[in-house]
């Protein structure tokens, strides 16, 4: 019971941190650069959370996966791997890593909206050439209804993602209340712990 309470508190804290840079609905205007920065904020916050549950033999980073002959994957939001990276660029505010393909356990793609697109499918296909598993973690399912989130989840799974998660449910209308998705959060942390 205490673990569930702690995990729920971490989920609520993560949602609060992301609220400093709120998502907008598809009906509101948003600058493209802001969307890119928003994605980095989400994936870096998720990396911080993963580190708390990740078994010690693993590392987690943002970067690209590299084969022995020098082929590079597309950029991966989150890579979980064992061993040492090929190279890592570290500054006070950023860390970008090149990870050997044979050391990768899972790659996690982050997105703001729980809405499948052709881009998700093509990016997934490109990543699967470099990683054994790919999870998708979306910030928000814009829906009042569980069945719409369930349908979106199934679409992502049908594309080939190994598992799919989202943080909260919200709706475009006047009531912008967020409904935290405890079930996915607990499942995600369990998946990380069981690597």
Write out the residue ranges for each language-model feature.
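Intrinsically disordered, low-complexity Ser/Thr/Pro/Gly-rich regulatory segments
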Residues: 1-76, 80-195
């Amino acid at each position: 019971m205490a673990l569930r309470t702690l995990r729920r508190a971490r989920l609520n804290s993560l949602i609060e941190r992301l609220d400093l840079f709120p998502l907008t609905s598809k009906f509101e205007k948003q600058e493209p650069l802001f969307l890119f920065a928003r994605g980095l904020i989400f994936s870096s916050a998720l990396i911080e959370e993963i580190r708390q549950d990740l078994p010690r033999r693993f590392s987690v980073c943002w970067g690209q996966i590299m084969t022995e002959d020098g082929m590079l994957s597309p950029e991966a939001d989150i890579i979980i791997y064992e061993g040492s990276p090929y190279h890592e660029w570290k500054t006070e505010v950023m860390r970008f890593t090149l990870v050997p393909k044979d050391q990768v356990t899972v790659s996690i793609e982050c997105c703001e909206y729980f809405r499948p697109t052709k881009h998700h499918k093509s990016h997934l296909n490109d990543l699967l050439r470099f990683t054994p598993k790919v999870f998708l973690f979306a910030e928000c399912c814009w829906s009042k209804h569980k069945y719409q989130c369930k349908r979106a989840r199934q679409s992502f799974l049908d594309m080939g993602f190994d598992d799919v998660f989202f943080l909260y449910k919200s709706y475009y209308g006047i009531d912008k209340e967020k409904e935290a998705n405890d079930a996915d959060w607990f499942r995600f942390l369990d998946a990380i712990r069981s690597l």
